[in-house]
Structures are given as structure tokens and as C-alpha cells.
Amino acid sequence: MLPESLVEYVREVGSGGTTCEEFTAGAIERTKKQGLDAYITLNEKALDEARRIDSRIKKGEKVGRCLGAPIAVKDNICVRGMRTTCASKMLEGYESPYDATVVTRLLAEDAIITGKTNMDEFAMGLTTEFSAYGPSRNPWNKECTPGGSSGGSAAAVGGLECIASLGSDTGGSVRNPASFCGMVGFKPTYGLVSRYGLVSYANSIEQIGPITRTVEDAAFMMDVISGADPNDATTIECKGGFLDGIDAGIKGKKVGLITEMAGEGIDPRVAEATRDAMAALEDAGARCGKVSLDMVKYSVAAYYTITATEAASNLARYDNTMYGYDMPIESYEFHSYISKARRKFGPEVTRRMILGGFVSSSGHGGRYYHRALKVRGLLAREAEEALAEYDLLLSPTVPILPFKLGEKMGDPVGLFLVDYNTVTANLTGKPAASVPYTVCDGLPVGMQLMGRPSGDAEVLQAAYSLQERSRMPEAPPWQ
């Protein structure tokens, strides 16, 4: 049996129980056979890199702590020499000339990048259906979405097409697909992980985070990728040691269930799972109660106003003069040239750019944007007050079960509401983890734990306690 977690992989390869080549070959074989469409680009040199790692181990040479672990990277994170398309025709064929800081840190610890995973175009979406390369599929049910926008990263880990992956989380884009695919997803405190080399969507909100099979694996990944970076002025210092204290427990900690995220509009099966998870945390020694965040009801509107405004600014560079799709000049008329270039954007990116231009236009005096910023500030204050009373805040990650591909494509507002429980952590910069807790009607349900800024270790410790008491099957039905 091959290892099924990153920590187990490192232990097995380190002890000679398996080899990097054996595991990597298995991951490549599964990628070719399973039909999850998790990748946009595969690393054709992965097996050669695995053999080199095995050779170094055999010779007794010093090898980084990843020991050749095959790790996938979302296609909006730059890897030198690989295509970085952001799942958009606008960047078709673009190869990054440099590595993102998170990739540099993984490679320094001798990880192998298996490839670039599928996503919603420019990370704008919740299902991967807005990818220019077609949707990815959920390993639990291939007719269902794996979530988004990091759906390919979650599907790849869920299908053991890699042992762990990186995604970006702007409003839940790591936690949402992790929940839908029965994996662990972690959004760190804003600034704890460098965004250098991440193609920008909404700079003040987004964060790179891991998608893994266990909480221990997420802690391992955080030990590798976190910390200050001179290339990203928003980063903060980090002590690390996330894995060392992972089993510290939750005894005596106060956990508050956010009532607005577990009440009206939630799927009854998810509501029942949430009550059960709360009881499980109490069984682990936590003191549980309920807490209200009144501003949550405005959070999705504020989130989409702010992110659309930042996206419109960030994507303005794709005007076909310095950045964007390389097309022949058919006219010397400047505005016509830009207009034709922008047709390469897909429908969701276009929708959000139009929204961003509208809410930030001088004709409206920026009043929509400023109101959204006010909501963000009030929500942050409420969250701080709640976390002064409670150590951690609990909610289901997503209020509904994974749904079929195509089911919500005609309902953009309904799709936006899938982010209802996750955007608060992004708007307030707080760490949050999604933990697979149970299975309802053959589909996984994840629980979200949110903590104080820089309380990432505490969130992971609580997530580990919940994982140990989860009702997930030992092996998913497709394995």
C-alpha cells in the first residue's frame, strides 16, 4: 500500500518503505486514468526528478524535508519554465520566467511540482466551470463540481494525483473545494504566506494556502511555505513549528458557533452535521456556545464589491500592449485593438470587471466601494469582539452539499452565496481551516474553524482535534 498522506509519505520514503519514483509513477498513472481533469499542465520531467531524489537518498546525501513529495500548484502561481495560464485564453502559452516564493520554498525542500492545476479563470468562480480548459470533476462523484476556484488542486489531492497541493483563497477558494472533495483546506492569516508570484486578483484579501489529505499535512506544508519575504511587503514573521504542536488538543478552549452561518438557508443535512461537530468538539474538551456576527448578512455583497473593484484594476494591464493575448495588429486604432484583445476574457471575468468598473466609477463617487469598506471594518470589529470571548469560531464551510456540474451556471447570485460562510475570514484577514467531517448521501461535508490573526497554530490544533473525531470513512468509496 502506498502512503496516503504527506506526513506518511515522508516517513515511508525516509525509512525505505517506498520510493519517490514509485509514488510519483502511481500519481501520474492515476492522473491519466481517473478523468478528473485536475491539471492544465503536467510536469513531464516529474519521474526523472523522482529518480534523482531516490538516487540522492540511496547515496546518503542530505535531502530536503519533502523528500521528493509530488505537490501540485494552482495555475495562477508561477513556476519557472511551466505554463501559467490562470485558466484563461488571455494567457494561453505564457511561461513564467521565475518561481513564486512558495514554489521556491517547496523546491528548496526537494518537493517535486507535478504540474499546474485547473481553476476558474483568474480565480473568479466557485466550480472550475469558468476555466477556459473545461471543468474539473469531484472524485466522490464525477458528475459533481469539485468546488472552486482551486477545484483542480482539491480534485488532484482527493484522487491521489499528488500528495498535497497549493491553491489561492480570495473568498473561500481553498476551503470551498477542500470541503466539496473531502480534503483539508487552510487559509492562513493574511501576510503569513508570501503572495510573490501569485497572479493578482484582489490583493488586499487573497492568500495562498495548502489543500491536503490530513490536518498534519497542512501543518507540514505551512512549516515549509510560511514566513516573511522581502519580495512581498505585506508578509509577516512566522515562528513555524505548526506540525510539532499539532496534537496539543482543544481542552478548555471556547468555541463559538456563528449563528448566521448555521441557520436559515442551510441544507438540513449540513445543519445536522454541524450540530454533531459541535458535540464532537465538546467531547474533546472544548466549551461550546453560540455567537452572532450581525454584519455577516452584508459580507457577500461587500466582498464582491471590493474584489470586483480590485480585479478591474489588476486586469486593466491585459490590454494587449504589454500583457495579455498575443494577437496580430489588425488596426492601428488604439481602443479597437484593446477591445479585441479583451474578448479573450471569459464571461465570469467580464462580469466582475464590469461590476468593478461600475461600483468604482466617478459617476457614483465611489460610494458603493466605500460602503463595502465600511462593512468590512464593522465585520472585522464584530469578529474581534467574538474572538475576545471565544478562542475559535465554528461553522459549516459551505452551507450546501456539492452540486452537479451545470446546475447553477444560470444563477450567478446563487453561486455567489456558496461563499457565504467563507468570505468573513478573507475580509478580516483571519486564519481558517476546513476539515472534512462527515458524508451525507455519498458526498463530503466540511466544517470551518476560524481563529485570531496569527493564531494559525491554534486553528490547526483545533482542526486536528475535530479530524480525530470526524465521521469520515477510512477510505473514500472510489479507492
From Swiss-Prot:
Record keyword Protein biosynthesis present: yes
Active site per UniProt: 74 (charge relay system), 149 (charge relay system), 173 (acyl-ester intermediate)
Matching Pfam families: Amidase (PF01425)
TM spans (from-to): none
Any one GO MF annotation of this record: glutaminyl-tRNA synthase (glutamine-hydrolyzing) activity
GO CC entries: glutamyl-tRNA(Gln) amidotransferase complex
Top-level division of the source organism's lineage: Archaea
Protein's job: Allows the formation of correctly charged Gln-tRNA(Gln) through the transamidation of misacylated Glu-tRNA(Gln) in organisms which lack glutaminyl-tRNA synthetase. The reaction takes place in the presence of glutamine and ATP through an activated gamma-phospho-Glu-tRNA(Gln).
Description of how the protein assembles with itself and partners: Heterotrimer of A, B and C subunits.
Protein name: Glutamyl-tRNA(Gln) amidotransferase subunit A
